[in-house]
């Protein structure tokens, strides 16, 4: 899935539709692991007209991903703003610092009597006080969305979230400002819609 820049569900649907044929399949209870050789990956990439994603395209890919503005919930925006705020000179940010900002964003909304997010969001006063639950939630979504596309990585041993070195080395001051501006603008638009939908 990561080779093709799509999610696992897309790969599974392609296999069911006969567009891909894995060389090996391993069953683990209700789950199945599909394996492809590098040659097969390239063959299907050409057959399906899938663009190659590598270090040379990663910055373009990153901004294209942000431009999609795929926000089923607000998570990506406060998460990325927190990462940018704490990222150091080698592209690392301590997960604890990111998490503190992430929690603080939602706690501030509760304190001000504003909706935390859409009704499907589980964040409430109780959950926001449970740092372990919040870290699990943040690493599942939104972090995993960035990890799947190889923009960010998490080192449990070092307790840091790191930006892909190839991407970090291409990011200039103007790029960071561009990301920050988009996230702030997208947050404002997102919550204008959420608050507009709230019945007072």
Predicted regions, residues:
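Intrinsically disordered, charged low-complexity linkers and terminal tails
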Residues: 1-200
């Amino acid at each position: 899935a990561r080779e093709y820049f799509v999610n696992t569900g897309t790969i599974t649907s392609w296999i069911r539709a006969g567009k891909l044929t894995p060389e090996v399949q391993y069953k683990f209870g209700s789950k199945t692991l599909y394996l492809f050789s590098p040659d097969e990956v390239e063959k299907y990439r050409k057959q399906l007209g899938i663009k190659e994603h590598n270090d040379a395209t990663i910055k373009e890919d990153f901004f294209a991903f942000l431009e999609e503005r795929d926000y089923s919930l607000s998570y990506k925006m406060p998460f990325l703003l927190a990462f940018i705020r704490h990222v150091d000179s080698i592209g690392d940010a301590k997960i604890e610092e990111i998490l503190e900002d992430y929690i603080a964003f939602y706690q501030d909304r509760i304190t001000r009597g504003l909706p935390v997010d859409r009704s499907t969001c589980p964040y409430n006063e109780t959950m926001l006080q449970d740092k372990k639950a919040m870290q699990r939630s943040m690493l599942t979504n939104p972090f995993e969305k960035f990890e799947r596309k190889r923009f960010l990585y998490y080192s449990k041993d070092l307790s840091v979230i790191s930006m892909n070195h190839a991407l970090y080395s291409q990011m200039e001051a103007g790029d960071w400002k561009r990301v920050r501006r988009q996230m702030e603008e997208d947050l404002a638009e997102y919550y204008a819609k959420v608050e507009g939908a709230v019945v007072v």
